[in-house]
Curated annotation (Swiss-Prot):
This is Plexin-A3. Belongs to the plexin family. PANTHER family: PLEXIN (PTHR22625), PLEXIN-A3 (PTHR22625:SF32). One of its GO terms (biological process) is motor neuron axon guidance. Residues 20-488 form the Sema domain. It comes from the Eukaryota. Coreceptor for SEMA3A and SEMA3F. Necessary for signaling by class 3 semaphorins and subsequent remodeling of the cytoskeleton. Plays a role in axon guidance in the developing nervous system. Regulates the migration of sympathetic neurons, but not of neural crest precursors. Required for normal dendrite spine morphology in pyramidal neurons. May play a role in regulating semaphorin-mediated programmed cell death in the developing nervous system. Class 3 semaphorins bind to a complex composed of a neuropilin and a plexin. It is a single-pass type I membrane protein. SUPFAM superfamilies: E set domains (SSF81296), GTPase activation domain, GAP (SSF48350), Plexin repeat (SSF103575), Sema domain (SSF101912). It comes from Homo sapiens. Interacts with CBFA2T3/MTG16.
Length: 1871
């Protein structure tokens, strides 16, 4: 059965509390999950989905999948098409599972879907076999509604009788067809006609409730949505959501309100007389929550039951509500968890029934016609089990039953709930719309504790079905694509007792002696006293006395007191972190004695940790071997404290040695008794005395008050003052006068620059060279310059008085008194009485005009404007202006307020200012003049606006910019000021307190009040919006909306607004007339990649109509946003060739939104700037190409979006002239004659070749028939071996390399430890540069320029091209979609270059001469890994195994690598070798006591060859890298208990003849059949040691020759096992001597003709391996093989090559065939076939390599389109497969045809696939390392790259050169 899901028993990493703990998940990719059911006994999980039902094991392993759809159907067909021919067109329709119930009595699953009007299937629980699917009667159709969560059902078992199904469902307006609630029979026979029939039905009553059609005619949208159903006692309950008909208006377009209700019926009531429904809800902090989302029935824990005052076996209902009553489909995220007791609900219902039967009120069921029918007084006794009568029913509740709020949430959106009781606690689990699981402990209605939140599925909502496993140890969560199994507790995540017991998880307790958080049942010793803690106060408490020790005091005995510990008589050890453990002494009192660490351990513990090191003293239980408790312990180190105050102020007993300037814990260490200080009062210290102020350049001493200053002793240096400023240090000798005073000697100090008037410096007093005296924290030393930043007298005198700066009049400079000549008369200081600065100057005044009434605040700026505001006198234009002290800035700025001018028409004038008296030196006036004006206004525009205000008014007049303050008043309200100039004031009109009316306007400019009689502003009725058309847009917005309303002309700047997920957007509107305006819809920010197809609804949608609040959010709006349209480019290259006037088809998606109504998107298509007429469909636009020719750009405009699709190449057909036609005819005739002559000559030549070919072919046929029997026997034997291998493979699997190793071996052949495999360790600036370089690589223009520039360099070698290609692909692996676009562009450029250079098109991609070709190889490497593992890897591995086993059946020369059996002539032994097969019994190296392993070897095998065969057999199925190597093992021949002989290739028994030394073989040692051997670790013999130097030297000489770039495998892969030692004159040989030796030359080996006997061996080997070669070729050249589909990458790349050929008008099929062959088989498959070690963890020897090369060559020949002419010079491998290649060629051609016929892959689908591939392997390589390697080429070709970036227009536009230069600069800064 085809799998429809991707089953991931994923170890999905969960964030949050789960950390990295895994949980299981079942994930689907091609369907949507809807419902979940868990078997209450077996724990099996059943999942309902769209078109599927799954059965899963409890661990979520898929057991069965049952297909339920799609089905041919039409929603309008009733009865469904399965019963009667339907008049409506049928189409495949998805079957959405809406109900999934387990019928335990009948051992079956009830699965109800949406097709055929809602039929159900009965599925056998064991295997989901369909037992029945009733669909013949109307009772079988439950409802055709499509919503998956609108139905709920309950099965009620009835003992001996059939079970009943109570089912509630939404009916989607079809109440005449479906009851909304019914009770139906569940017959044991699924084919029974009574299945699903109503439990009771006669002509008057039945077991059903229907929504009256009159209700639907009034409220077409009315429906009842069933959320949850359950049984309690003898009642059946349903929680529902239904339209609130009392709040919802009859207008269908109006806003809809919903209410939640609980429905109750008696389970045994077949007439539904007991139907009662009550509104329910919850309130919290005054906010109502009325939209029920989910519910769960449970028992309360004992603590909750006690808090509620109900029995512990009472049923309670945990319920989730969303806030408000709107947006049922997309409810608000503000949600609440509430609790109802069933007893309370039943009490409300009982009281309601009793009141109705007393005749009080009406039936009050709003959606029934008889809702206003009065209750009939019927005296009778009504108790809690009353099930109704024929009267007073159905009944509705009058008041809302309020739940108890437990937990509110406003972010995640709670969506589902489940609960159960654990011990005394109620534990509630909540799924959220953000994809997380919340865990809540509820111990009371005011005691709900959210103790854990676990992310499960990022961004995907958890659906309603939240279920427990039968043992309540796991919980199953359902989302649209995933079922997740999470443990109900994750106690082990808590690492301490406090974290464990403080988490709030009731499942968790602390297992004391095992120091772990777990359930009590998982704790060994939990039953012992204090063995298991469940309360925080019961955690182990540890107290240590003393709790600190000096680092100089080792081995102190510590007393440890323990509380809350179990019996410790088994013993306890103490340990200080890494220090050694010491056994503790257990005292009778229960206390422990532990020694502190030794001196050596203390040094290790405290080194580098400063003054204190807090270490954990840990106690280890000898009973459990676990460290179960501990306490912090402090080791203090006084010696690191460098000052007296820090030393004696330490909390530890530290003492300061004054004369040694050291801190110690040992007071006796001080040299002098009087030098010891043990309290802060005795410390030498500079006393606080204010800031130390030092003028620059003044030679002066500095005296400081101090205390306890030590007197330097003999040999100690005196005091010094050390000053550090601006990085410079100045040391000044100082004198200690006594213990309380010190003076720095005469010195001057300075700092550079005048940017600052003062600067703080680092000042300290030291003695004896470097012993600083402590300073108080508040001590500051300031160095200052009087003249810096104080250029005027006023600024000088307002300097800090402490600086004692004054103004030197003669010098015009701010200086100290001592620096000013004649200071008594020439130096001014603020302390001097009457000091004032002369020559004030005004530089600016503002404003320059004002009303004569005064009140204008004039700001005057200048210098020397007085030192106090009271000493400044001002007149402005002759009028007094009063200074405002609060705004005065000494000497710099004065703000004054004008008095009224009493002159009728006052003239303008300057500002006059006096400082003190008005003598000439202290008086000034401004150059600017101030003028008096009379402001007036005479017009307001607009003259009318809405009563809510918000209109932008422009009041026009003259001199309106006068004064400093302006107030506009409309009637009695202030108009909000915006701006003004001389001719106009702009303000925003206020709200009219009188509503629509006329209002006067007045102005107040400072103290001038201005009015304009007769000028009136009219407040009108507020505008309203009554209708929108259309009520939808696209995500981008900017589509036209026609708005109907009233009074729209009064709106000045209307805008339309939308608010979505908290983000508000707006767009413009244009008013057309008073009742209509045209708007452009605002776009919304989606926040996720794809919008829903059914559209997105904004949280708010409305209009900004000035300040009209009622239009901001239209309550009745159902505005919808649909996905934006998107278009495909015109072609891969963006150019499409068409004829003039032909149709142009533009393909796209979402071109017609799925919106109701006739409105459509308005598309404009511009071709060459000219619009064309359009025809629009769902997926394409059709327009006519214009009449112009040439290249015309194509652009599509829609809704503010612009799509540039490419270029149309419009080419007209031109008729040929008569001379041209005659010339063509003549030329054609000549050409025909030339072709005829060539063909005649060619025919003669080919006839000779054909005769030679036929002769050779005949020889081959004869030889092949002669060896057919041998081939058959050899194949049968090999097939037996391979069958054994494949059987073993089923157990151990093929040794595939991991993705990372595989990719590195292909991308960087021969480099196993490439830098990209490890993270780069680099300085921060280089790392930053590389990250910027990585960003630059995401610029297509840069990468293309970069690569093309490198390729243009003559020194850029082939190896460099491959390296750059590989590094680029690694660097871009996280963006494979982008890398693919780059690759396509590079390939397109390569094709263009190939054609321009007149090269034959078939040469394209043949060799790796460009970066693009290697990138293509790497691209396939990345994307075909999965195909290799799942499909092609197996036949390739079997071929490798077959070759290896077949080769090893015959002799193989260890020196030359030649073999008896070979596909390669070059590796064929040309002599007769006598050999016998031996079976050795090998002792397993790792377990000599296990069974011996029989191994077949040849007696002519060298010892190393024998070891390899033994290792292959003993470690069968083990990857090569994980098993021992032959060179690391010795072969030991055991001839008895005592006789053991080490066999070696060379030893003292080795035979030497002349100068030839023969390798030892098994025959040399006379090893017999059945011998016992063993592989033992290598032993170095004297002989080996003597020869190791010679052998190593010889090996190193051959290594460079034998290692090739095609294989990253070790030297053993390519080289013979033993290398001849020619330097010593002795030549090694094994089976045959080297062919180059004169005495043994067999003839001319250069000849390609093979003698008959050797060709026979080649043919025999070829025939034996034929099936394995065929299997591999068939797999590779099949579009669907072994259940695997064709990889997307192959189809996508082949289509790209076809498109390139189409664009370049290459119609030759051979060229296209060759391109594809060069692209995939040549570039990828040949590489993999020749080097299987790229894919598998194997060892490839030289003979296997040679045979694989023959297979790879055959593979290449099969892909070629040219005919292979065989002759006497043809290679043997071409002769070998001459008969097979035509067949293989047909496979290749069929393969290419099949791919071409397949549906194209869209760029979007390919991008999605590539993004997923990037995600899967995002962390496999170090991108930073790849960028670092790639940057080498930037460095090497720096200038060329920068020049190329300058030349490229696109690079210049994006300033790519500057960006690269920035990177180069960053890197260079580190060098």
């Amino acid at each position: 059965m085809p799998s429809v899901c991707l089953l991931l028993l994923l170890f999905l990493a969960v964030g949050g509390a789960l950390g990295n703990r895994p949980f299981r998940a079942f994930v689907v990719t091609d369907t949507t999950l809807t419902h979940l059911a868990v078997h209450r006994v077996t724990g099996e999980v059943f999942v309902g989905a769209v078109n599927r039902v799954f059965k899963l094991a409890p661990n979520l392993t898929e057991l069965r999948a049952h297909v339920t759809g799609p089905v041919e159907d039409n929603a309008r067909c009733y009865p469904p098409p399965s019963m009667r021919v339907c008049a409506h067109r049928l189409a495949p329709v998805d079957n959405i599972n809406k109900l999934l119930l387990i019928d335990y009595a009948a051992r079956r699953l009830v699965a109800c879907g949406s097709i055929w009007q809602g039929i159900c299937q009965f599925l056998r629980l064991d295997d989901l076999f369909k037992l029945g699917e009733p669909h013949h009667r109307k009772e079988h159709y439950l409802s055709g509604a499509q919503e998956p969560d609108s139905m709920a059902g309950v099965i009620v078992e009835q003992g001996q009788g059939p079970s009943k199904l109570f089912v509630g469902t939404a009916v989607d307006g079809k109440s005449e067809y479906f009851p909304t609630l019914s009770s139906r029979k569940l017959i044991s026979d699924e084919d029974s006609a009574d299945m699903f029939s109503l439990v009771y039905q006669d002509e008057f009553v039945s077991s059903q409730i229907k929504i009256p059609s009159d209700t639907l005619s009034l409220y077409p949208a009315f429906d009842i949505y069933y959320i949850y159903g359950f049984v309690s006692a003898s009642f059946v309950y349903f929680l529902t959501l239904q339209l609130d008909t009392q709040q919802t208006l009859l207008d269908t377009a109006g806003e809809k309100f919903f209410t939640s209700k609980i429905v109750r019926m008696c389970a045994g009531d077949s007439e539904f007389y007991s139907y009662v429904e009550f509104p329910i809800g919850c309130s919290w902090r005054g906010v109502e929550y009325r939209l029920v989302q989910s519910a769960h029935l449970a028992k309360p824990g004992l603590l909750l039951a006690q808090a509620l005052g109900v029995p512990a076996d009472e049923d309670v209902l945990f319920t989730i509500f969303s806030q408000g009553q709107k947006n049922r489909a997309s409810p608000p995220r503000q949600t609440i968890l509430c609790l109802f007791t069933l007893s309370n609900i039943n009490a409300h219902i009982r009281r309601r029934i009793q009141s109705c039967y007393r005749g009080e009120g009406t039936l009050a069921l709003p959606w029934l016609l008889n809702k206003e029918l009065p209750c009939i007084n019927t005296p009778m006794q009504i108790n809690g089990n009353f099930c109704g009568l024929v009267l007073n029913q159905p009944l509705g509740g009058l008041h809302v039953i309020e739940g108890l709020p437990l937990l509110a949430d406003s972010t995640d959106g709670m969506a589902s709930v489940a609960a159960y009781t654990y011990r005394q606690h109620s534990v509630v689990f909540i799924g959220t719309r953000s994809g997380s699981l919340k865990k809540v402990r509820v111990d009371g209605f005011q005691d709900a504790h959210l103790y854990e939140t676990v992310p499960v599925v990022d961004g995907s909502p958890i659906l309603r079905d939240l279920l427990f496993s039968p043992d309540h140890r796991h919980i199953y969560l359902l989302s649209e694509k995933q079922v997740s199994q999470l443990p109900v507790e994750t106690c082990e995540q808590y690492q301490s007792c406090a974290a464990c017991l403080g988490s709030g998880d009731p499942h968790c307790g602390w297992c004391v002696l095992r120091h772990r958080c777990c359930r009590e049942g998982a704790c060994l010793g939990a039953s012992a006293p204090h063995g298991f803690a469940e309360e925080l106060s019961k955690c182990v408490q540890v107290r240590v006395r003393p709790n600190n020790v000096s680092v100089t005091s080792p081995g102190v005995q510590l007393t440890v007191t323990l509380h809350n510990v179990p019996d410790l008589s088994a013993g306890v050890s103490c340990a200080f972190e890494a220090a050694a453990e010491n056994e503790a002494v257990l005292l009778p009192s229960g206390e422990l004695l532990c020694p502190s660490p030794s001196l050596q351990e203390l040094r290790a513990l405290t080194r580098g940790h400063g003054a204190t090191r807090t270490v954990r003293l840990q106690l280890l239980s000898k009973e459990t071997g676990v460290r179960f408790a501990g306490a912090d312990f402090v080791f203090y180190n006084c010696s690191v404290l460098q000052s007296c105050m820090s030393c004696v102020g330490s909390p530890y007993p530290c003492h300061w040695c004054k004369y040694r300037h050291t801190c110690t814990s040992r007071p006796h260490e001080c040299s002098f008794q009087e030098g010891r200080v043990h309290s802060p009062e005795g410390c030498p210290e500079i006393l606080p005395s204010g800031d130390l102020l030092i003028p620059v350049g003044v030679m002066q001493p500095l005296t400081l008050r101090a205390k306890n200053l030590p007197q330097p002793q003999s040999g100690q240096k005196n005091y010094e003052c050390v000053v550090r400023v601006q990085g410079r240090q100045q040391r000044v000798p100082a004198v200690r006068f006594n213990s309380s005073s010190v003076q720095c000697q005469n010195a001057s100090y300075s700092y550079e620059g005048d940017e600052h008037g003062d600067t703080e410096l680092d000042f300290s007093v030291v003695w004896d060279g470097d012993f600083p005296i402590d300073k108080p924290p508040s001590f500051r030393a300031l160095l200052y310059k009087c003249w810096a930043q104080r250029p005027s007298c006023g600024l000088c005198l307002k300097a800090d008085p402490r600086f004692n700066c004054g103004w030197c009049i003669s010098e015009h400079r701010c200086q100290l008194r001592t620096h000013c000549p004649a200071p008594k008369t020439n130096w001014m200081h603020l302390s001097q009485k009457g000091t004032r600065c002369s020559h004030p100057r005004i530089t600016q005044i503002h404003p320059l005009v004002g009303p004569k009434e005064g009140g204008t605040r004039v700001t005057i700026v200048g210098e020397n404007l007085g030192l106090l505001s009271r000493e400044v006198g001002l007149r402005v234009a002759g009028v007094r202006c009063n200074s405002i002290p609060a705004e005065y800035i000494s000497a710099e700025r004065i703000v004054c307020e004008m008095e009224e001018s009493l002159v009728p028409s006052p003239p303008p004038g300057p500002v006059e200012l006096c400082v003190g008296d008005c003598s000439a030196d202290f008086r000034t006036q401004s150059e600017q003049v101030y003028s008096f004006v009379t402001p007036t206004f005479d017009q307001v525009s607009p003259s009318r606006g809405p009563a809510s205000g918000g209109t932008r008014l422009t009041i026009s007049g003259s001199s309106l910019d006068a004064g400093s303050r302006v107030t506009v008043t409309v009637r009695d309200s202030e108009c909000q000021f915006v701006r003004r100039d001389a001719k106009a004031i702009v303000c925003i009109s206020p709200l009219s307190t009188l509503g629509p009316s006329q209002a006067p306007i007045t102005l107040a400019i400072d103290r001038a009040n201005i009015s304009s009689p007769g000028l009136i502003y009219t407040y009108t009725q507020d505008p309203t919006v009554t209708r929108l058309e259309p009520t939808w847009s696209i995500i981008n917005g900017s589509t036209a909306i026609t708005v109907s309303g009233t009074h729209l002309l009064t709106v000045q700047e209307p805008r339309v607004r939308a608010k979505y997920r908290g983000i508000e957007t707006t767009n413009t509107c244009q008013v057309i007339n008073d009742t209509a305006m045209l708007c452009k819809a605002p776009g919304i920010f989606l926040g996720r990649p794809q919008p829903r197809a059914q559209g997105e609804h904004p949280d708010e949608f409305g209009f900004l109509l000035d300040h009209v609040q009622t239009a901001r959010s239209l309550n009745r709006s159902s505005f919808t946003y649909y996905p934006d349209p998107s278009f495909e480019p015109l072609g891969p290259s963006g150019v499409l060739d068409v004829k003039p006037g032909s149709h142009v088809v533009l393909k796209g998606k979402n071109l017609i939104p799925a919106a109701a109504g006739s409105s459509r998107l308005n598309y404009t298509v511009l071709i060459g700037g000219q619009p064309c007429s359009l025809t629009v469909s769902d997926t394409q636009l059709l327009c006519d190409s214009p009449s112009q020719t040439g290249r015309q750009p194509v652009m599509v405009l829609v809704g503010g979006l612009e799509f540039w699709l490419g270029t149309l190449h419009i080419s007209a057909e031109r008729a040929l002239t008569l001379p041209a036609m005659m010339g063509l005819a003549a030329g054609g005739g000549l050409l025909l004659l030339a072709i005829t002559a060539v063909l005649v000559a060619y025919k003669r030549k080919t006839q000779d070749a054909d005769r030679t070919l036929k002769r050779l072919q005949l020889q081959m046929d004869n030889l092949e028939s002669r060896v057919a029997l041998e081939c058959k026997e050899a194949f049968a034997e090999l097939q037996t071996d391979i069958n054994e291998l494949t059987n073993h493979m089923d157990e151990v699997q093929i040794p595939f390399l991991d993705y990372r190793t595989y990719a590195v071996r292909v991308l960087f052949p021969g480099i196993e430890a490439h830098p990209v495999l490890k993270e780069l360790d680099t300085p921060p600036n280089v790392e930053k540069a590389l990250r910027l370089f990585g960003q630059l690589l995401h610029s297509r223009a840069f990468v293309l320029t970069f690569i093309h520039t490198l390729e243009a360099q003559s020194s850029f070698s082939m190896r460099d091209r491959g390296t750059v290609a590989s590094l680029t692909m690694v660097a871009l692996q996280s963006r494979l979609d982008y890398a693919t676009g780059l690759l396509k562009q590079l390939l397109a450029d390569l094709i263009e270059k190939n054609l321009e250079s007149k090269n034959h098109p078939k040469l394209l991609l043949r060799r790796t001469e460009s970066v693009a070709e290697k990138m293509l190889t790497n691209w396939f490497t990345f994307l075909l890994h999965k195909f290799l593992k799942e499909c092609a890897g197996e036949p390739l591995f079997l071929l490798y195994c077959a070759i290896k086993q077949q080769m090893e059946k015959g002799p193989i020369d260890a020196i030359t690598g030649e073999a008896r059996y070979s596909l390669s002539e070059d590796k064929l032994i040309r002599q007769q070798i006598d050999y016998k097969t031996l079976t050795l019994h090998c002792v397993c190296p790792e377990n000599e006591g296990s069974a011996q392993v029989p191994v077949k070897v040849l007696n002519c095998d060298s010892i190393t060859q024998a070891k390899d065969k033994l290792l292959d057999t003993v470690y069968k199925g083990i990857p090569y890298s994980q098993r021992p190597k032959a060179e690391d093992m010795d072969l030991e021949w055991r001839q008895g208990r005592m006789t053991r002989i080490i066999l070696q290739d060379e030893d003292v028994t080795t035979k030497i003849e002349c100068d030839w030394k023969r390798l030892n073989s098994l025959a040399h040692y006379q090893v017999t059949d059945g011998s016992l051997v063993a592989l033992v670790p290598k032993q170095v013999s004297a002989y080996n040691m003597a020869n190791s130097f010679t052998f190593t030297r010889s090996l190193s000489r051959y290594e460079s020759l034998l290692r090739t770039a095609s294989s990253p495998d070790s030297l053993r892969s390519r080289a013979p096992m033993i290398t001849p030692d020619q330097e010593t004159g002795t030549k090694l040989w094994h089976l045959v001597k080297n062919h180059d030796h004169a005495d043994h030359r067999e003839g001319d080996r250069g000849s390609k003709m093979v003698s008959e006997i050797y060709l026979t061996r080649l043919l025999a080997t070829k025939g034996t391996l034929q099936k394995f070669v065929d299997d591999l070729f068939e797999t590779v050249f099949s579009t669907a093989h072994r259940g695997s589909a064709l990889p997307l990458a192959i189809k996508y790349m082949f289509d790209f090559l076809d498109e390139q050929a189409d664009q370049r008008q290459i119609s030759d099929p051979d060229v296209r065939h060759t391109w594809k062959s060069n692209c995939l088989p040549l570039r990828f498959w040949v590489n993999v076939i020749k080097n299987p070690q790229f894919v598998f963890d194997i060892h490839k020897n030289s003979i296997t390599d040679a045979c694989l090369s023959v297979v790879a060559q055959t593979f290449m020949d099969s892909c070629s389109t040219s005919e292979h002419r065989l002759g006497k010079d043809s290679p043997s491998n071409k002769l070998l497969y001459a008969k097979d290649i035509p067949n293989y060629k047909s496979w290749v051609e069929r393969y290419y045809r099949d791919i071409a016929k397949m549906a194209s892959i869209s760029d979007q689908d390919m991008d999605a696939y590539l993004v997923e591939q990037s995600r899967l392997h995002a962390s496999d390589f170090s991108v930073l390392s790849a960028l670092n390697e790639l940057y080498f080429y930037v460095t090497k070709y720096r200038q060329e790259i920068l020049t190329a970036l300058d030349r490229d227009a696109s690079c210049r536009k994006h300033k790519l050169r500057q960006k690269l230069e920035q990177i180069i600069s960053l890197v260079s800064s580190d060098s």
